[in-house]
Swiss-Prot record:
Keyword match Cell wall biogenesis/degradation: no
Main location group: nucleus
Gene name of this polypeptide: hoxb8a
Species assigned in the record: Takifugu rubripes
Name of the molecule in the record: Homeobox protein Hox-B8a
Comp. bias intervals (Basic and acidic residues): 206-233
């Protein structure tokens, strides 16, 4: 399809001079075009430059080294004589100055790049020189001293009260409930966990148990036994005090009997004949 359009253009425009506008046909432009290399465009190939005869004589050795392009003899090739910028309506001098400015900028940028590369190289060298130095140690990275101990956590009255109520309800907390309690009391999960562990140990010491009850019913049974034991101990101490009081009362009774015996022994004996005489007279 591309060959069709190229052939149609080739048949309509026989030479490249007809494609150039008339206002470019001046002596200066012709001289410039004659001094400039000729550019040949072909399908599937890049731009091929054909230099002027004086330039070819000056660079005679380059003509022998450049291979000939087989696409130049193709009938589909479009040959444009002169500067390719003239074909598109651009001035060759402006393009030349533009390229010159770009070359100067590139030279300046290359110096900057070289300086930047040297600076980077210097920084890399400094980094390699500083790398053998020991890394910075933060306080949390250093091991704790032997004489130092972690501070004891203090709980407020409100926190202690809430933790005690939670312990009475359930001595063992699940992970979800522990998170809820820690958020409610402004504590960490670790602090709540440690508090419950210490509270269970305290309960075992108070109840003389080697193992904390796993269920609430077992805990209630243990509490009941403890209360009964306390009641027995209190009743035993009260009975011993009452027995001592009863013993004192017995001593008092025996003392009273001896007093009565002594009083009875001190009175004279009663005469039976006198009693009978008085009864007959009545």
């Amino acid at each position: 399809m591309s060959s069709y359009f190229v052939n149609s253009l080739f048949s309509k425009y026989k030479s490249g001079d007809s494609l150039r506008p008339n206002y470019y046909e001046c002596g200066f432009a012709q001289d410039l075009a004659s001094s400039r290399p000729t550019v040949v465009y072909g399908p599937g190939s890049g731009a091929t430059f054909q230099h002027a005869p004086q330039i070819q004589d000056f660079y005679h050795h380059s003509a022998s080294t450049l291979p000939s392009n087989p696409y130049q003899q193709s009938p589909c090739a479009v040959t444009c004589h002169g500067e390719p910028g003239n074909f598109y309506g651009y001035d060759a001098l402006q393009r030349q100055t533009l390229f010159g400015a770009q070359d100067a900028d590139l030279v300046q940028y290359s110096d900057c790049k070289l300086g930047g590369a040297q600076g980077l190289g210097g920084e890399d060298a400094e980094g390699t020189e500083q790398s053998p130095s020991p890394t910075q140690l933060f306080p949390w990275m250093r091991p704790q001293a032997a004489g130092r101990r972690r501070g004891r956590q203090t709980y407020s009255r409100y926190q202690t009260l809430e933790l005690e109520k939670e312990f009475l309800f359930n001595p063992y907390l699940t992970r979800k409930r522990r998170i809820e309690v820690s958020h409610a009391l402004a504590l960490t999960e670790r602090q709540v966990k440690i508090w419950f562990q210490n509270r269970r140990m305290k309960w075992k010491k108070e109840n003389n148990k080697d193992k904390f009850p796993s269920s609430k019913s077992e805990q209630e049974a243990v509490e009941r036994e403890r209360r009964e034991r306390e009641l027995r101990e209190s009743s035993g101490s009260g009975g011993a005090a009452g027995g001592g009081g009863g013993g004192g009362g017995g001593e008092g009774g025996s003392g009273g009997g001896s007093v009565a015996a002594t009083t009875a022994g001190s009175q004279p004996p009663v005469n039976v004949d006198c009693c009978e005489k008085t009864h007959k007279q009545m």
